[in-house]
């Protein structure tokens, strides 16, 4: 799985990168701003993206998520300590992983979302730390 990390805190981005690569996935880039994320979306292909709501250039994560989801066809997971800043429609993202998160919660979220992406439905229990958008809960038959 090719994964893009959009996170402006270098330590957090590095930890997330280590977790992703430890699971055997490829990190195609790390962006700290919406501008960098849009550039990476043009030059790389990602299947999954972790997108912080608040980036170095402001509250731009929702715009990045919508672009990645709708234009680049990536599945997006928001990472944020402020879930109330996520729009009601989740900006087309599949869900939210609330900070601070543990290594276990990231690994569980990735495994769950990858299963859903590959099969079109959930094969395992949704991780407690992952809040799914209503659209993805319906799509992945999480009634």
Predicted region positions:
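Receiver (REC) domain switch/active-site region of two-component response regulators
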Residues: 102
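Acidic, metal-coordinating helix/loop segments flanking the phosphotransfer/catalytic sites
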Residues: 17, 30-48
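A Lys-centered signature of the CheY-like receiver
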Residues: 99
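Short amphipathic alpha-helix used as the core "switch/output" element in two-component signaling
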Residues: 59-74
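Active-site residues of response regulator receiver
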Residues: 52-53
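Two-component/phosphorelay signaling modules centered on CheY-like receiver
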Residues: 9-29
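Conserved acidic carboxylate
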Residues: 7, 80
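CheY-like receiver
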Residues: 108, 116-143
């Amino acid at each position: 799985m090719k994964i893009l990390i959009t996170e402006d805190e270098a330590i957090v981005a590095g930890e997330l990168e280590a977790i992703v690569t430890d699971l055997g996935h490829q990190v195609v880039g790390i962006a700290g701003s919406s501008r960098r994320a849009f550039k990476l979306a043009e030059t790389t292909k990602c299947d999954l993206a972790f997108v912080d709501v608040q980036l170095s250039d402001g509250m731009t994560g929702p715009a990045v998520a919508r672009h990645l989801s709708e234009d680049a066809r990536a599945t997006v997971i928001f990472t944020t300590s402020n879930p109330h800043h996520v729009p009601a429609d989740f900006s087309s993202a599949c869900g939210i992983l609330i900070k601070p998160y543990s290594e276990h919660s990231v690994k569980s979220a990735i495994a769950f979302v990858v299963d859903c992406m590959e099969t079109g439905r959930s094969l395992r229990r949704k991780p407690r730390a992952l809040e799914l958008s209503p659209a993805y809960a319906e799509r992945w038959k999480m009634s």
